[in-house]
């Protein structure tokens, strides 16, 4: 369908994780395990993970840290999950609920393809052209606050789909939900190739950003300069962009109260 509007290249996302001075392939696969332990076969990798899990002897996980350790063992969790997760959520893994991680995909094949989709790629030249063509014939209003607009134009549509924050929609009646935000810093570098890959995740807690994106690798562009963007997790405050909600028991209980209100809406 989308190829009717733009041409897609054949980019395949194969991120790299950097922990201190060590580089690992993502998602967790045989290339990751071979670099970490020197193993060569799936059986050796599975045995190493099972050995570490058995040594920890964790019963019912009480928090995300115990859940992660029980799923993948100490090395993978501490090098590739713990610090990155704590940066994302702004909390210690010991203070996050176990249910945030249901499972951690481990692939016992030498394959760095992050996704399993048959068709993968990125719109050549970016997604602006695609968005413009998809929106042809559709009235779009930017820089428009939903609340005063809908108050001044009741019944403007037969059905309204609100995709903003549910607590804001109800005037924070039960209080604010907790969200996480992100901050991006983009920099032009006077070099042809900065990191050799589109995405490099920084998994240690002490590095303030979670990843660096080098944009030219999405389209294999050739130029004497390059642009990189660093992604920093941030606490959310009212007025900031909310990127994702904090998924814990307190927040979920508050969300359930707002959802009950939403279920009573007519349209």
Per-segment meaning from a language model:
Residues 1-6:
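Glycine-rich FAD cofactor-binding loop and adjacent beta-loop-alpha segment at the N-terminus
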Residues 11-13, 17-159, 163, 167-170:
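Active-site/ligand-binding neighborhood in enzyme catalytic cores
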Residues 168-267:
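C-terminal segments that line or cap access tunnels to active or ligand-binding sites in enzymes
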């Amino acid at each position: 369908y989308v190829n009717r509007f733009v041409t897609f290249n054949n980019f395949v996302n194969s991120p790299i994780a950097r922990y201190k001075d060590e580089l690992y392939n993502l998602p967790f696969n045989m290339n990751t395990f071979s670099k970490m332990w020197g193993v060569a076969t799936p059986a050796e990798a599975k045995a190493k993970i099972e050995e570490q899990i058995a040594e920890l002897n964790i019963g019912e996980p009480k928090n995300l840290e115990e859940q992660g350790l029980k799923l993948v063992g100490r090395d993978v969790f501490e090098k590739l999950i713990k610090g990155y997760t704590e940066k994302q959520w702004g909390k210690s893994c010991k203070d996050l609920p176990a249910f945030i991680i249901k499972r951690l995909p481990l692939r016992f094949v030498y394959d760095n393809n992050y996704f399993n989709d048959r068709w993968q790629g990125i719109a050549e030249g970016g997604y602006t052209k695609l968005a413009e063509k998809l929106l042809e014939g559709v009235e779009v209003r930017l820089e428009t606050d939903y609340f005063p607009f809908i108050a001044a134009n009741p019944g403007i549509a037969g059905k309204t789909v609100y995709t903003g924050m549910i607590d804001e929609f109800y005037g924070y009646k039960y209080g604010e939900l907790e969200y996480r935000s992100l901050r991006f810093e983009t920099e032009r570098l006077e070099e042809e190739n900065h990191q050799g890959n589109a995405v490099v995740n920084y998994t240690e807690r002490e590095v303030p950003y979670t990843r660096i994106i080098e944009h030219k690798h999405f389209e294999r562009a050739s130029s004497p300069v390059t642009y990189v963007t660093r992604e920093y997790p941030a606490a959310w405050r009212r007025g900031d962009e909310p990127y994702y909600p904090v998924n814990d028991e307190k927040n979920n209980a508050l969300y359930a109260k707002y959802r009950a209100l939403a279920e009573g809406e007519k349209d």
